[in-house]
Regions:
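P-loop NTP-binding core
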Residues: 1-335
């Protein structure tokens, strides 16, 4: 069974995407699921959280160049530029580059409670003109670079090694994140209940919905080549609130947000009747927003990143319930 691929994203920054990626990954790893987390943010926040917990290196800046996602992207970008063409991509006649990265870029968090189940691919911001945003800009010069992420995952044998692959996406859309959009099976949107999010989240969903068509209509790609490397477009699992503050206007914002998503004619997995008990479902009802939320506690973020200092990647109890519900949805949908 292939690993399920899920990305966490939102156009708005500061809503807890990275914290949520790590926390949900950690809770699932605690339950015995094999998790791979991939850091796509140029700020490398997820990598900083994880970096001190693998042994051998004291901080992210000490990781060698060929132990990062940056190196893998650079490697495949140069391969596509100099050796691969659309014919080889279509037929699958791709050289095995896994030998250059397989033993180098996947790290396991050594915290004993995870029993080797919590893993990550770090990104780094120390390389001049080779941070992830720099690489994404260079990738955009050749549309075939959109196939880099599925190639990396395939040659790392990720489908055989992991149950779930989590992508921590930055608040932007470029060829790198679009590659992740298309390679993913599902996505989750952490957000806060405010006026900006009421329209920002639906805009983000609209962008994701349009990406597949964008590349299918490109004359150098087309639907057949896309289908050879990507499956169907990803499904929205649902939206959940982070940094929740209890006030009278909060439900108003959430109600409008849920209604705006409804108008997109996008059916989230959460909107299925069998998950009605996971949603707001009393006097106030939602279809796409979980009723469980992460309370506004700065300690959640600090305890997640506390690993930078204490060599201890911590789970926070506030994420236990939402993690269990997401896992139940994923397991139910793949039966």
């Amino acid at each position: 069974v292939a690993a399920l691929k899920i990305f966490f994203g939102n156009y708005k920054g500061g809503v807890g995407k990275t914290t949520s990626t790590f926390q949900i990954g950690a809770w699932l790893a605690k339950k015995g699921k094999k998790i791979l987390m991939i850091d796509l943010d140029p700020q490398s926040s997820l990598s900083h959280i994880c970096a001190n917990n693998v042994g051998g290196y004291q901080k992210l800046g000490e990781y060698p160049y060929n132990a990062t996602l940056n190196y893998a992207l650079e490697l495949y970008m140069r391969y596509i530029k100099n050796k691969a063409n659309d014919y080889q991509l279509l037929t699958g006649e791709i050289d095995d580059l896994g030998q250059y990265i397989e033993d180098n870029i996947i790290f396991s968090i050594k915290e004993s409670e995870y029993q080797g189940n919590l893993n990550f691919i770090p990104s780094s911001m120390v390389f001049k003109n080779a941070r992830l945003n720099d690489l994404a800009q260079r990738m955009s010069q050749n549309v075939l670079n959109v196939f880099i992420m599925p190639l990396i995952l395939k040659q790392l044998n990720c489908d055989e090694k992991f149950d779930y692959i989590f992508f921590d996406c930055p608040p932007t859309s470029n060829i790198l994140t679009q590659s992740v959009f298309m390679v993913s099976d599902y996505y989750i949107i952490p957000t806060i209940g405010d006026e900006v999010s009421m329209q920002g989240v639906p805009d983000y969903i609209s962008e994701i919905e349009s990406v597949y068509v964008k590349y299918a209509m490109h004359d150098d790609i087309g639907g057949i080549l896309l289908n050879a490397h990507f499956g169907d477009k990803p499904s929205l699992i649902g939206v959940f609130e982070t940094i929740y503050k209890s006030n009278a206007s909060n439900l108003d914002f959430i109600g409008v947000l849920d209604s705006n998503i409804d108008q997109l004619s996008v059916d989230s997995v959460l909107s299925k009747e069998k998950y009605s008990h996971f949603r707001y479902n009393n006097d106030f009802k939602t279809r796409h927003v979980f009723r469980d939320f992460i309370p506004h506690r700065s300690g959640i973020v600090s305890e997640t990143s506390m690993s930078l200092h204490l060599q201890n990647a911590k789970r926070h109890e506030a994420y236990k319930v939402i993690s269990n519900k997401i896992l139940e949805i994923l397991e139910t949908e793949t039966v």
